[in-house]
Regions:
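C-terminal motif of bacterial Sec signal peptides marking the signal peptidase cleavage site
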Residues: 16-18
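Low-complexity, intrinsically disordered or signal/transmembrane-proximal segments
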Residues: 24-26
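Positively charged n-region of N-terminal signal peptides that target proteins for export
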Residues: 1-4
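Bacterial signal peptide processing site
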Residues: 20-22
Length: 182
């Protein structure tokens, strides 16, 4: 029951975040043809495969996210939602993020890399996708393994499948981290 309430609260926040931008202009000049001039959600979501996460897996996640966002934003045409979520180019995780004693990658280092890639453009939220174990320091515990991390608020998130019991739940963790960024 608690999980259901948290999920409903998260969906509500996503809905409100999408509605709060009104008719503002989003000046995406120079960003390429893949970005809509006025994104229906007020931002564009880029899914970026990292390391051994394949482009095909990222595309499957994109389709699931569009489906779930279509349920949330039922008045937004599917074509507009599809234009707001795209799969970016694959990138390697920097070696500087690797923590050898635990065989994990520091999520904060990955977030910094993703943030710097867009130069702080808040209209694009980049979500890094990996199968590797990621970690952060939390609640006084150094190098704690996590499923995802996000700048709050911000323009970058990272999500890992390493700790997921069911790989088809990746879209839930992705939306969870995305909501932190808004």
């Amino acid at each position: 029951m608690k999980k259901l309430l948290l999920f409903i609260a998260g969906i509500s926040i996503l809905f409100l975040a999408g509605c709060s931008n009104g008719n503002q202009s989003h000046g995406n000049e120079g960003m390429g043809d893949s970005l809509p001039a006025d994104p229906p959600l007020g931002y564009v979501i880029e899914l970026k495969p990292l390391g051994n996460f394949s482009h095909q897996e990222a595309e499957q996640l994109r389709e699931e996210l569009v489906k779930q966002l279509g349920i949330i934003f039922n008045k937004v045409p599917k074509a507009e939602l599809e234009a707001s979520v795209f799969v970016g180019d694959k990138k390697e995780i920097p070696a500087s993020c690797f923590y050898k004693p635990r065989n994990r990658y520091w999520a904060g280092g990955i977030l910094k890399m993703l943030h710097e890639e867009h130069g702080g453009n808040d209209e694009i939220v980049t979500i890094g996708l990996t199968h590797r174990d990621i970690s952060t320091s939390i609640h006084g515990q150094y190098n704690y393994g996590i499923m995802g991390l996000s700048f709050r608020p911000g323009d970058a998130c990272v999500v890992s499948t390493f700790r997921l019991k069911r790989k088809d739940d990746l879209w839930k963790v992705t939306i969870h981290e995305f909501l932190h960024s808004r």
